[in-house]
Regions:
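A contiguous, low-structure linker/loop signature
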Residues: 78-118
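Conserved beta-strand-loop-beta-strand hairpin that lines the nucleotide-binding pocket
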Residues: 72-83, 87, 164-191
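Conserved short strand/loop->alpha-helix "switch" segment adjacent to the catalytic nucleotide/phosphoryl-transfer site
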Residues: 42, 46, 134-157
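Conserved ATP-binding N-box helix of the HATPase_c
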Residues: 52-54, 146-181
């Protein structure tokens, strides 16, 4: 029997615990899972990476991939495509609904796409690429001195290494800069 896991309408660090609890309940008795994101209106990198991790964990003992219904809002689908989410999702889910096919991920001053970290050898390459883009984001968007971004690079490297060493499997990393002037009157970066 297929069990439903609703992806929150606003999927970020604040709604992740709700998602994780639903995932835990649905996966407790085994069976195939359906991650329903059709009503999702927004997802942060935190939510997208969390959804990929759940998909990785939800593969059935028989090897069947979990199901994923994609968001119906065109702008959400477009963002998920630009973020690189579907590159990883195609490997993990049986995807239902129309979604952007393989898009070339272009460099952006506000988005570092979802990037797979699969082995210790990957960490240096992944961190090197992401570090270059992160420095551009942190210095241009947040006005941080490029030298001061080394702490960010070290934290990112440690996080990527922890994926490999402690998770016992691969993982993903993504970074997005947000302009929340309405709420905070400043720019922030969410990792």
């Amino acid at each position: 029997m297929t069990k439903l896991v609703d992806v929150p309408t606003q999927f970020d660090d604040r709604s992740f615990d709700q998602f994780a609890a639903a995932f835990g309940r649905a996966s407790a008795d085994g069976g195939r899972l359906l991650f329903d994101a059709h009503a999702t209106e927004w997802a942060s990198p935190y939510g997208l990476v969390g959804l990929l991790a759940a998909g990785q964990a939800a593969r059935s003992p028989a090897g069947e991939p979990p199901l994923l219904t994609v968001p119906t809002a065109p702008e959400v689908l477009s963002y998920w495509g630009r973020s690189g989410f579907f590159r990883g999702a195609r490997e993990l889910f049986e995807i239902h609904g129309k979604f952007p096919r393989a898009q070339a991920v272009t460099d952006s001053d506000v988005l570092l796409p979802v990037t797979a970290v699969r082995a210790a050898e990957d960490v240096h390459d992944v961190v090197g690429h992401i570090q270059q883009r992160a420095i551009a984001i942190l210095s241009s968007e947040l006005g941080i001195d490029p030298k001061a971004t080394m702490g960010f690079a070290m934290a990112l490297s440690e996080a990527c290494q922890n994926i490999v060493e402690h998770a016992g499997t691969g993982g993903w990393v993504a970074v997005q800069s947000y302009h929340w002037r309405r709420r905070l009157a400043r720019r922030v970066v969410v990792i």
